[in-house]
Amino acid sequence: LAVYRNDQVDFSFGAEIGAGGYLAPVKATADASSEVAQVTDTVSLPGARTIGVDATTNAVVGEYVQIGTTGTDGTEIRRIKSFVAGVSLTFTAPIGYYHRSGVVVQGVETTTGTAGTMTGLTLDTNTMDHMRFTPGAWESIEVPDPTMEIEPRYFLGVGAKRNYYSAYKGQQSLSGTLSNFELLNGYPLRFPIGTVSTTGADSGAGGSTVDGIIYAGQYEFDITSASGYVADDYIQVDVGALAEVRKIVAVSSNNIFVDYPFLLDHADDVACNEVVAPYIHTITEAVELPGISWQINNKDSSETATNDWLRRYYGGKIGQATLTAEEGGTLRMSWESAPFLNMDHNQYDDTVQTAPGNKFDATSLAVTVERPSTEPYYFSQGSISMFGVEFARVANFTININNNLEPRYFISSTAERTPSAIFEGRREYSMTATIVLPDSLASTATTRTLFKELLAEGDYAAGFTGFDIDLVFTRGANDTLTITVPSDGTSAAGGNEQGAFIRSANTSVSTENPASTEVDILFRDLSIVVKDSEPVYP
């Protein structure tokens, strides 16, 4: 008999542009007799649960509609939760993409007798899986399946013999953990921090400008001239902090489809040109963290596709994360805390008892997971500099990031009692390290040491500035990962300017030799720059 094996699980993730708007560019067989509506009066933005329409003919709560025309303007499918006749449709999950005014909303065929399947469900014509990314070489996942708060109530005088009288449903929470995975590229780094911009080296081909605004959530757009643009090449749109690189999937006249939606808005007439490696990815802080979706596919031992158990978690944020490495090992990361707004899955159930709130979604589709072929970042390839001094004998280090996320539960019409939103609290950074002491020096030497810096408390001639930290991993030519503290690389006195401070640096006496110091460091911000051959970062 076939069984579900943990070593046959596929895990992948994708970014979200609007909270809860998972990116699933799917299409299905249209129901010719059921054109539900047409969006005409407004655009529909990523993260919206409700879209405006000019009609709701044949709209039925619980049925599915495809938003967008296959191979033309990008498509996705959502389930109708409610509607206002002739005005709007509200879905069970937020939409993931940007949709122009006038986009067709079409009912799609489903088979709900026993299988709960959707007829003709597949990827949209001119794109790729948008939830295809893997964070690295991982081994275990604490899956964010819902935790149900069932609350017993004790009433006086009901003859319950000290037992609770009745149990009531409370809130649902979803939180997962992906621990101790080896970094193979910089994909997962931005999610506990903020945004990413990507630039490439100009290839000398395909130079043009954008024709019309590109909105976050689009994966098709117009340019003034498509001359020199070829499918499977890479295109950079915009420059500086707004630059994004995407793979060209299809070119039709001056219209271009790319492999992944844009995460940022881009103004009309900005530059777009074909680029090649190396690519430089700059990760900078943002007040609001990027959203993230996870998908887990449990395959059985016979690898029978119809037995795949798919679970998709959306509306997530990475609340706590660590970066760690130790001698003889590799650079590893953990997403320590990842709360989500909700989930769906492909386990069909039409029973009256469980179907109303079981989170089934017929649009669940297995993705082809993209697995990097790059080497890890080895500890031996790293270097750490603090207060201008490179430390050659670092035994281990850990960088901690805490966003103090708080899921909130507001009044809503949903019966699921899941979080309404997840808000960021104060951001906290810290770093710990074990550093073997350098060769002995005369007590009169002027060399800066951990002990001296501890006593200095970051207070120098220029004021209470703290100090800089530079952490660099070099895998090869044009292949580096650089973490800089503070984010602009220059510590200075005053608010929003300081660098790092040593809170403790204990050099204890033990049986281990040579002597080492356990360092605890506080800092207020950082920036990360990754140079590699990966063009598209989620």
Stretches found by the model and what they are:
Residues L1-S44, A48, N58-S82, G86-P538:
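Signature of extracytoplasmic/envelope-associated structural regions
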